[in-house]
């Protein structure tokens, strides 16, 4: 793709459209970012906000909402621990975005021929090194924000949740998962082996912005499991039990897989849009390595995974595959009356997002890298992730409360 401007490289702020000429001669008109039309401090402030990519922050909020809904079955919420955890998730997403902004520009992925919104490092508003440092600082703050849950800080139990200053036993599962999430957020495009440049972006997003995020959110609310506090066991054994309990929570795994799959679909649309410029910068995403046809099938498959896994909630709700206190699955066949009484909203509510998923699939099939409709498809994929995750959270919370009333 060759960029052609009617003005010099740094176009005047009044110019609202950038003309791009593709390799086949087609011309796309990419709208300039709104902050580029501003001047002075207003432009700087707007660029700071744009650098955080506010529209992407739902990728941090949705796993927290789903994990919070799962925690409804564990007892009263622990908001003094959960609210800092939400702040940690948001800071982690912002830090990942800033590091991505700086590193993609440094490595040439965000060059003059880039499609999509203008990045602040690419536009020269801020030095890439400073953007990188701000991203690292956000990731450090994200780790610090998990301290109340990691240290099990005690509070008085009132709705306001005033901390008493007492520290409980260190929750090693929270420490390990938070540290690994921060490292993954940085290593996505930072460090000596950027995961996003080696076709590992979707895998990273699925694990850390899906499964791990949901598990951490639930754990922040529910606190340490009682069976991990065996006074006769060593501290190391209790820590291992704690980590196993958090990672082997089947409900959190399934919910995390659903939200993670749609976050991956969002990333796959983004990589399809940028496939041409990524290939030129040797950023080997799955769309670059296996082609655009594969990327389109990948988007469909990831969306299908999220909806197919909804059956899990129906099966566990009616009693098929339920686990007893000993962790062993039950095998009793549910009666028709039981099925009617235990209908799962967690399995049906997300189905309201099916039309949106079909729209994303139809749009993605018609896309080619750099096409002017790529950003609209990306917005639709983000809306799907938000709608599906919100409906799943509401359904899980409803099922948990219904089950508590039946108990």
How would you name each of these model-derived features?
Residues 12-84, 88, 229-242:
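Topogenic membrane-insertion module of multi-pass membrane proteins
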Residues 65, 203-218, 379-390:
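Small-residue-rich segments of transmembrane alpha-helices in multi-pass membrane proteins
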Residues 74-102, 171-186, 247-269:
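Membrane-embedded alpha-helical segments that form the functional core of polytopic membrane enzymes
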Residues 91-115, 264-287:
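Acidic (Asp/Glu-rich) catalytic motifs at the cytosolic membrane interface
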Residues 112-169, 283-319, 379-391:
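Multi-pass membrane catalytic core of lipid/isoprenoid biosynthesis enzymes
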Residues 117-229, 235-242:
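Intramembrane alpha-helical segments
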Residues 204-275, 293-296, 329:
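Functional transmembrane core segments of multi-pass inner-membrane proteins
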Residues 315-404:
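Extended hydrophobic alpha-helices typical of membrane-associated regions
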């Amino acid at each position: 793709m060759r960029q052609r401007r009617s003005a010099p490289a740094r176009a005047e702020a009044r110019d609202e459209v950038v003309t791009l000429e593709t390799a086949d001669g087609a011309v796309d008109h990419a709208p300039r970012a709104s902050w580029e039309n501003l001047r002075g401090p207003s432009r700087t402030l707007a660029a700071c906000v744009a650098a955080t990519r506010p529209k992407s922050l739902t990728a941090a909020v949705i796993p927290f909402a789903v994990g919070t809904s799962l925690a409804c079955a564990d007892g009263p919420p622990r908001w003094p621990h959960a609210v800092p955890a939400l702040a940690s998730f948001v800071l982690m997403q912002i830090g990942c975005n800033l590091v991505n902004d700086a590193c993609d520009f440094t490595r040439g992925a965000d060059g003059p021929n880039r499609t999509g919104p203008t990045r602040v490092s690419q536009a020269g508003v801020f030095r890439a090194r400073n953007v990188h440092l701000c991203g690292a600082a956000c990731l450090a703050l994200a780790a610090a924000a998990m301290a109340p849950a990691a240290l099990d800080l005690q509070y008085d139990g009132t709705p306001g949740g005033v901390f008493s200053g007492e520290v409980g036993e260190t929750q090693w599962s929270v420490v390990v998962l938070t540290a690994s999430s921060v490292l993954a957020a940085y290593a996505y495009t930072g460090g000596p082996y950027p995961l996003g440049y080696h076709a590992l972006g979707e895998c990273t997003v699925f694990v850390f912005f899906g499964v791990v995020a949901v598990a951490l959110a639930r754990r922040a609310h529910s606190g340490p499991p009682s069976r991990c506090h065996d006074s006769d066991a060593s501290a190391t054994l209790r820590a291992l039990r704690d980590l196993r309990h958090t990672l082997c929570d089947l409900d959190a795994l399934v919910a995390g897989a659903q939200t993670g799959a749609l976050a991956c679909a969002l990333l796959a649309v983004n990589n399809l849009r940028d496939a041409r410029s990524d290939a030129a910068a040797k950023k080997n995403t799955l769309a670059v390595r296996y082609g655009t046809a594969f990327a389109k099938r990948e988007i469909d498959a990831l969306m299908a995974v999220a909806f197919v896994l909804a059956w899990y909630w129906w099966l566990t709700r009616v009693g098929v595959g339920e686990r007893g206190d000993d962790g062993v699955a039950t095998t009793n066949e549910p009666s028709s009356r039981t099925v009617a009484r235990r209908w799962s909203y967690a399995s049906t509510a997300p189905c309201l997002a099916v039309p949106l998923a079909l729209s994303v699939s139809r749009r993605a099939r018609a896309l080619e890298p750099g096409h002017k409709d790529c950003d609209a498809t990306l917005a639709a994929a983000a809306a799907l992730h938000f709608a599906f995750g919100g409906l799943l959270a509401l359904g899980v919370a409803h099922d948990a409360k219904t089950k508590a009333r039946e108990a």
